[in-house]
């Protein structure tokens, strides 16, 4: 509740992640910077998912909220349209933010109450069993970020059951070339056996085959996403080795729905019309 100049807002609330390992759901999506009408439709779709499934607890955004990160009027419009994600009873989904390449300047840090120098990358614990590590593909991958990443992964694995990472530019893209961070990040992902990597930026849909050491491996990591929260969708290249023979690509506005249980992580691409484009299950790793 907010109160200012004698005016009082309606009451809002959110739900925290369960501490006892109970099932819950996380929504992920990126690239809402353009296509404002479709951005609004996707916000309503997310709200509908949270209304129909009370286990949806939070929304992880993969970056590129707006076109120009230094323009407050664009942020103001994004924030206003984001209110469509509020449920009728006042429940809101906390945002776990990622910085995109269009989100330059300091307004991003002000909007999400992050320290400019220390919160470009951060870890969010969702209960005791799920950790989401957020990285910044706009900052150098080596040096402080790589050191921080390895320290986090070493601390979290095998302590948590599910270990996820999110960042903006893909390591195994379906449209563009790979992020320059791939030679630094991917070996650490492999070393500490993360479960899934959530990507944006390509404006398409993608699920790779499981990858380890730069090749297909059943023990490897699946990279999913590429961003469909409003932007026009691009045509992906389905002939890349990490997509053929078990992966999948497409073009449609979407979010990625992640359903966590003690034994399985169910990953679904949900389209604007509520249909599922892909439905994939990852089993918990044994240590």
Model-derived features with residue positions:
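Acidic, histidine-bearing metal-coordination/catalytic regions of metal-dependent phosphoesterases
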Residues: 1-28, 33, 52, 251, ...
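Extended active-site neighborhood of metal-dependent phosphoesterases/phosphodiesterases
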Residues: 1-13, 72-159, 184-185, 190, ...
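Active-site glycine-centered loops adjacent to acidic/histidine catalytic or metal-binding residues
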Residues: 31, 63-64, 100-101, 135, ...
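Histidine-centered catalytic micro-motifs
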Residues: 32, 164-171, 195-205
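Short, solvent-exposed loop/turn elements at domain surfaces
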Residues: 35-39, 105, 142, 173-174, ...
């Amino acid at each position: 509740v907010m109160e200012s100049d004698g005016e009082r807002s309606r009451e809002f609330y959110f739900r925290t992640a369960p501490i006892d390992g109970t099932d819950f759901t996380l929504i992920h999506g990126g690239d809402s910077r353009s296509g404002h009408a479709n951005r609004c439709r996707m916000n309503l779709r997310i709200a509908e998912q949270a209304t129909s499934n009370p286990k949806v607890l939070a929304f992880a955004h993969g970056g590129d909220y707006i076109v120009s990160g230094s323009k407050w009027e664009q942020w103001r419009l994004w924030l206003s349209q984001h209110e469509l994600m509020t449920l009728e009873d006042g429940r809101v989904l906390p945002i776990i933010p990622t910085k995109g390449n269009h989100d330059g300047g300091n307004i991003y840090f002000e909007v999400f109450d992050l320290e400019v120098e220390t919160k470009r990358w951060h870890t969010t614990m969702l209960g005791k069993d799920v950790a989401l590590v957020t990285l910044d593909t706009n900052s150098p991958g080596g040096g402080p970020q790589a050191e921080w990443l390895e320290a986090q992964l070493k601390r979290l694995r095998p302590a948590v059951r599910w270990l996820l990472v999110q960042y903006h530019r893909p390591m195994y893209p379906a449209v563009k070339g790979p992020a320059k961070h791939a030679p630094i990040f991917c070996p650490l992902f492999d070393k500490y056996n993360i479960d899934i990597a959530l990507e944006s930026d390509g404006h398409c849909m993608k699920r790779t085959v499981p990858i380890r050491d730069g090749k297909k491996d059943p023990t490897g990591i699946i990279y999913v996403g590429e961003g469909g929260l409003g932007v026009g969708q691009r045509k992906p290249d389905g002939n890349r080795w990490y997509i053929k023979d078990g992966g999948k690509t497409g073009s449609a506005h979407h979010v990625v729905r992640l359903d966590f249980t003690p034994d399985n992580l169910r990953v679904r691409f949900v389209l604007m019309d509520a249909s599922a484009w892909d439905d994939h299950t990852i089993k918990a790793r044994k240590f």
